[in-house]
Swiss-Prot record:
NCBIfam families: NuoD, PRK06075.1. Its EC number is 7.1.1.2. It comes from Pylaiella littoralis. The keyword Lipid metabolism does not apply. InterPro entries: NADH_Q_OxRdtase_suD, NADH_UbQ_OxRdtase_49kDa_CS, NDH1_su_D/H, NiFe-Hase_large. One of its GO terms (cellular component) is mitochondrion. Its main location: mitochondrion. GO terms for molecular function: NAD binding; NADH dehydrogenase (ubiquinone) activity; quinone binding. This is NADH-ubiquinone oxidoreductase 49 kDa subunit. Core subunit of the mitochondrial membrane respiratory chain NADH dehydrogenase (Complex I) that is believed to belong to the minimal assembly required for catalysis. Complex I functions in the transfer of electrons from NADH to the respiratory chain. The immediate electron acceptor for the enzyme is believed to be ubiquinone. Component of the iron-sulfur (IP) fragment of the enzyme. Component of the iron-sulfur (IP) fragment of the enzyme. Keywords: Electron transport, Mitochondrion, NAD, Oxidoreductase, Respiratory chain, Translocase, Transport, Ubiquinone. Belongs to the complex I 49 kDa subunit family.
Length: 398
């Protein structure tokens, strides 16, 4: 007598695991609840807020000058680009225009910061996938750029160099020469990183057709920066809505085709090359002149003036105790930060402290899209997708 086979109608439950918040590839304090069917991701649920510090509320209790250092500590990889947005928003409320030399210096260091960010993004992305060498090469170059930060502001990371009304101090001739020397050799270092990664079969297998974002999806989810341009949309605030001196500079917009992780990697590498071109133009075209606005109620007098003039001493004291009184109004200012569109919505009631400061961080929008980007991919691909999003939790959690 043949035994009848039993029919099983049981439904297998999906496996749920925690990714992070203490994971080397989480890029900070990301906690992901991953729902897996075998090794295939069915759902990725990001849990944020582990680095929340209440920055927007803290800014309301500070003067406009005292609020500036908070912006260094949001995206702590692209510090001066965040200062840039805040300084521009305060200047918009004050309705002042800064000297042309100060604008050149700002753009120069904004592009140095872009290279700093992209080197870390590409280097860490490579290390997450399994390539250690590009990470070490990237940090070797970042060290040189951080030295430029230190020489101009005294700090390697949290510079507080851009100020409402200009920059804190002028750059020296020796520093300009050293930046020239860096620009001359950095292209070759980029070639070495590309030689290691771009045509590497393993690198391509891990990135091509992974985390594909169509142009419409990128718009619907509010993506910006490389995440938007990688999907084929030409949107760069430096080109489309130029600020400072970007309209006077010649550089190419970088656009991808397929919207996958590999395209976004190529876009970041090419953006570093375009930043080199912008830095070179800034150094060659930079005019002489002041680096601060000539208004003692906005920009503090120099140390030498404070020691010689009682009026300058009074201005200095009043500026740093009471702060600058900004006319009532509101403004939204956005710049093309390395990770995307970084925006500051600033409201003034006519006092020396902001009434409201709302910060728009690009990483927040990008992290929202992680679920649809990771769905139906393997567990190992989640690390690749997080790396290509270039998430930093200082700006996401704020």
């Amino acid at each position: 007598m043949a035994l009848k086979k039993k029919e099983f109608n049981k439904k297998l439950k999906h496996f749920t695991i925690n990714f992070g918040p203490q994971h080397p590839a989480a890029h900070g304090v990301l906690r992901l609840i991953l729902e897996l069917n075998g090794e295939v991701v069915q759902r990725a649920d990001p849990h944020i807020g582990l680095l929340h510090r209440g920055t927007e509320k803290l800014i309301e209790a500070k003067t406009y000058f005292q609020a500036l250092p908070y912006f260094d500590r949001l995206d702590y990889v692209s510090m001066m680009c965040q200062e840039h947005t805040y300084a521009l928003s305060v200047e918009n409320l004050l309705q002042v225009s800064i000297p042309r030399r100060a604008q050149f210096i700002r753009v120069l260091f904004a592009e140095i910061t872009r290279i700093l960010n992209h080197l870390l993004a590409v280097g860490c992305h490579a290390m997450d996938v399994g390539a250690m060498t590009p990470f070490l090469w990237a940090f070797e170059e970042r060290e040189k750029l951080m030295e430029f930060y230190e020489r101009v502001s005294g700090a390697r990371m949290h510079a507080s160099y851009f100020r409402p009304g200009g920059v804190s101090q002028d750059i020296s001739v020796g520093l300009v020469d050293d930046i020239f020397a860096f620009v001359a050799q950095f292209g070759q270092r980029l070639d070495e990183i590309e030689e290691m990664l771009t045509d590497n079969r393993i690198w391509q297998e891990r990135l091509v057709d992974i985390g594909v974002v169509s142009a419409q999806e990128a718009i619907d989810w509010g993506f910006s920066g490389v995440m938007l341009r990688g999907s084929g949309i030409r949107w760069d605030l430096r080109k489309n809505e130029p600020y400072e001196i970007y309209s006077d500079l010649n550089f190419q917009g970088v656009v991808g085709k397929t919207g996958d992780c590999y395209d976004r990697y190529l876009a970041r590498v090419e953006e570093m090359r375009q930043s080199l071109s912008i830095i070179y133009q800034c150094l060659n075209k930079m005019p002489r002149g002041s680096v601060k606005i000539d208004d003692a109620k906005i920009s503090p007098p120099s140390r030498s003036e404070v020691k010689q003039s009682m009026e300058s001493l009074i201005h200095h004291f009043k500026l740093y105790t009471e702060g600058v009184f900004v006319p009532a109004g509101e403004t939204y200012t956005a710049t093309e930060a390395p990770k995307g569109e970084f925006g500051v919505y600033l409201v003034s009631k006519g006092s020396s402290r902001p009434y409201r400061c709302k910060i728009k961080a690009p990483g927040f929008s990008h992290l929202q899209g992680l679920n649809f980007m990771a769905c139906s991919h393997m567990l190992a691909d989640v690390v690749t997708i997080i790396g290509t999003q270039d998430i930093v939790f200082g700006e996401v959690d704020r």
